[in-house]
């Protein structure tokens, strides 16, 4: 696993300094750039995940926040709306699509996500590789409950 992240870091380093993808000398980096960074195809799951995101952006449901991580510099507890979390903390559309393409390209058997939030990133990952086991951890019980509801909406059963 460590080697995989080293290779991904190499990709980003080389890709950021290359003028074109053809100046990438590593075959791994070239393949990853083509399959993940240069891919502009619209996949079936994007529409479904974004429909769930739009539902969350319209939701005024209040959630109790329990933040065990770095979080904000303010309080670690309190209430927040689903809309605010979906707007400010969830994976963006671009990040989600990049996660989808990366998972689709790498075809892992197991994925681990730490800090699920509302499950947007999890939905992209689970939809990309339906045969993979996705383990998603969220410390805040209310966020985990919303994430589970969202995953059930898309019938993503490969997430635990």
Language-model features, listed with the residues they occupy:
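A short alpha-helical cap/connector motif
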Residues: 1-160
